[in-house]
Each structure stands twice: as C-alpha cells, then as structure tokens.
Swiss-Prot record:
PANTHER family, A to Z: 2,3,4,5-TETRAHYDROPYRIDINE-2,6-DICARBOXYLATE N-SUCCINYLTRANSFERASE, MOLYBDENUM COFACTOR GUANYLYLTRANSFERASE
Keyword Transferase among UniProt keywords: yes
Family per similarity comment: Belongs to the transferase hexapeptide repeat family.
Protein name, UniProt field: 2,3,4,5-tetrahydropyridine-2,6-dicarboxylate N-succinyltransferase
Gene3D superfamilies, sorted: Hexapeptide repeat proteins, Tetrahydrodipicolinate-N-succinyltransferase, N-terminal domain
Length: 274
C-alpha cells in the first residue's frame, strides 16, 4: 500500500502536466487501483481512528488525478446518454451482483464509480459522487446529493433534497462527515467538512458550513464545524452585539441519548423544542 501511495503522491506533485494522452502506465494503473479499492469499500478517504476522524489525503489526491488522466466518454443510461470522465458504478452490474451486494437503487439514481454503497442501503432518485462512502442501513432520499469523498454512517436518513458537500469543487481539506444514526431533514445542507456527530437530528432547512455558528441554547456555547453527538438542531438567528441586526445560525435546542431516540420518534423530537 505504501508503494501505491508513493506513486499517487509523486504524480500529484506534477498533476498540472498530466493529460490523458501523456500519463504513464504506472500512474494510470495506480489511480485505477485506488478507485477500485474505494469503490469496494476496502479503502475510504476518511475513517475514525481512536475516536478521531483521520483524512487520508493521498486517496483524495488519487480521486483528483482520475479527472486528469481520463478523457470524457459517452456513457449509456436508461433514460439518456452522458459524457463524462468518471464511469457509473452500476454500468456492469447484473441482477446477481445487485442481489449479492444487497442494496436497492431506484431510477434514476446515479452513483459514480469509486463510491462505496453498503448493504441494506436504499438509494432513491439521488446522486452519490466519487470517493463517497455510504454505510449500512442508510436511506438517501429523493434528490439528495452525497458529495465527493463524503462519509455517511450507518442507519442515517438523508431526507429529500439534502445536500452533503464534497471536497473537489471547491477544493476542501477534509470531507463532510455524517456519523451513525443521524437524521438530516429535508433541504438541509451540510458542507465544507462539517462533522455531524452520532445520533444527531438536523431539522428541515438547516445550513451548516465551517463559518456557521452552532449555538447551544442550554449552555450558551458556540460550536463551529461540528455538531456534538445527540444534538437536535434547528435554524435560528443570533443578534449582533449592537442589537441592530441578526445573522443566521443553527441552534441546538436539546440533547438526546440513544435510549430517548429509541423511544421517541424523530418528528416528536423536532416538535417539542420549546
């Protein structure tokens, strides 16, 4: 694996000079191997090690290199034809392979090759970009998008129209992460490497970026780039120091543990926020 990483790191340093016409065989095969390993879930761009999320930057570099070394090509789909550098994940799947891998894909959901989809996942008409990791039991609902290299945990619900930001455009240092057992409400956006920690509930229409204030109304604490585990979050505003205006923020209205979440439905958690 170290040799593979070395090839990617070296090629990335000279990426500006690499084209589909001049890329060497070693680099092409290394990138192809990494994309295949990401696609199968054997490797992932970020993983939790000793309680901390670690981003493997060289894997992200391999994803970026894949766009340098591949030409656009015609891609046939059921509803249309496409013209892109990255092939579709399910292009060669037959019924036996879908049955073996154990997830559902509802048309016209689209997944790029290099994204991992775990068992018991349901993809409604949605989009999952290259390098993303979607873990077991997760629902990606209609018109939700999972950005490049985003990490989605087990038993997550991404509601209709949710946007989970990627790392490629604009280039971000770390992927956006939704940990296990989270609920992300309809039309919410989580971007710029924000981490939503385990068991959190994000209400409809909440926007979270690195500069978004995440205000805990019980403690008065303000978080940036991280929603603490077990938080129930809604949209809100905080007043300016002079009181002349207010700016958007996200508000943590309560904290819940796994036991409470198991007994109380998501809708009930969001309705009882006074």
């Amino acid at each position: 694996m170290q040799q593979l990483q070395n090839v990617i790191e070296t090629a990335f340093e000279r990426r500006a000079d690499i084209t589909p016409a001049n890329v060497d065989t070693v680099t092409r095969e290394a990138v192809k191997q990494v994309i295949s390993l990401l696609d199968s879930g054997a490797l992932r761009v970020a993983e939790k090690i000793d309680g901390q999320w670690v981003t493997h930057q060289w894997l992200k570099k391999a994803v970026l290199l894949s766009f340098r070394i591949n030409d656009n090509q015609v891609i046939d789909g059921a509803e249309s034809r496409y013209f892109d550098k990255a092939p579709m994940k399910f292009a060669d799947y037959d019924e036996a392979r879908f049955q073996k891998e154990g997830f559902r894909v509802v048309p016209p959901a689209a997944v790029r090759q290099g994204a991992f989809i775990a068992r018991n996942t349901v993809l409604m008409p949605s989009y999952v970009n290259i390098g993303a990791y979607v873990d077991e039991g997760t629902m990606v609902d209609t018109w939700a998008t999972v950005g490049s290299c985003a990490q989605i945990g087990k038993n997550v619900h991404l509601s209709g129209g949710v946007g989970i930001g990627g790392v490629l455009e604009p280039l971000q240092a770390n992927p956006t992460i939704i940990e296990d057992n989270c609920f992300i409400g309809a039309r919410s956006e989580v971007v710029e490497g924000v981490i939503v920690e385990e068991g959190s509930v994000i209400s409809m229409g909440v926007y979270l970026g690195q500069s978004t204030k995440i205000y805990d109304r019980e403690t008065g604490e303000v978080h940036y780039g991280r929603v603490p585990a077990g938080s129930v979050v809604v949209s809100g505003n905080l007043p300016s120091k002079d009181g002349k205006y207010s700016l958007y923020c996200a508000v943590i209205v309560k904290k819940v543990d796994a036991k409470t979440r198991g007994k109380v439905g998501i809708n009930e958690l969001l309705r009882t926020i006074d």
